[in-house]
Amino acid sequence: MPSFDVVSELDKHEVTNAIDNAIKELDRRYDLRGKGSFEQKDLTVQLTAEAEFQLEQMLEILKLSLVKRKIDIQCLEVKDAYASGKTMKQEAVLREGIDKELAKKIVAHIKDAKLKVQAAIQGEQVRVTGKKRDDLQEAIALLRGHEFGMPLQFNNFRD
C-alpha cells in the first residue's frame, strides 16, 4: 500500500551556515559593527545588542540569511527582548518536528477533504497511506496549498 510521511525538519548544517553569514553581515554593517552579536546553541540563537532597534535590525539580517540558505522562516519563533545590564538580549528558536496539535490539524485537514487516504500520527511525523499513488499526490497538493504555520516536507514516498 503506497504511503508517505509528512515531517518538519531543518538542515542543521545550513542553519549554522546561515548564522555564520549573519555574523559576517553584522561585521560589514557600519551602523552595527561591534555593537551586537549572534550566539548559536543547538537550534537557539541569542541576539545581543546595545539597543532594541539594533536587535530589530539584527533579526532582519538573521531572517534574510536564513531565506538565502532556503530555510523557511516560519519555523523561527522570536521571543520578547529583555534588558540584561546595559545590553538588550533576544532569543530566536528554530522549531523542528511536528507537535501533537499540528499533527491533529494535518490529520483533520486531510479527513475534511474526504480524500481516499488515511492519516496516522507517529511521534513527530504523520504517515499518510492510500490505495493509489494519485490519491497520495492529491494529499500532498492539498497540504502544500494550506498554511499550517510550519514548513512541511514530504519524504519516504513508497509504492
UniProtKB/Swiss-Prot annotation:
InterPro entries noted in UniProt: DUF520 (IPR007551), UPF0234-like_C (IPR035571), UPF0234_N (IPR035570), YajQ-like_sf (IPR036183)
Example GO molecular function: nucleotide binding
Domain of life: Bacteria
Keyword presence, Chaperone: no
Keyword Nucleotide-binding in annotation: yes
Similarity section: Belongs to the YajQ family.
HAMAP family named in the record: YajQ
UniProt name for this protein: Nucleotide-binding protein PST_3153
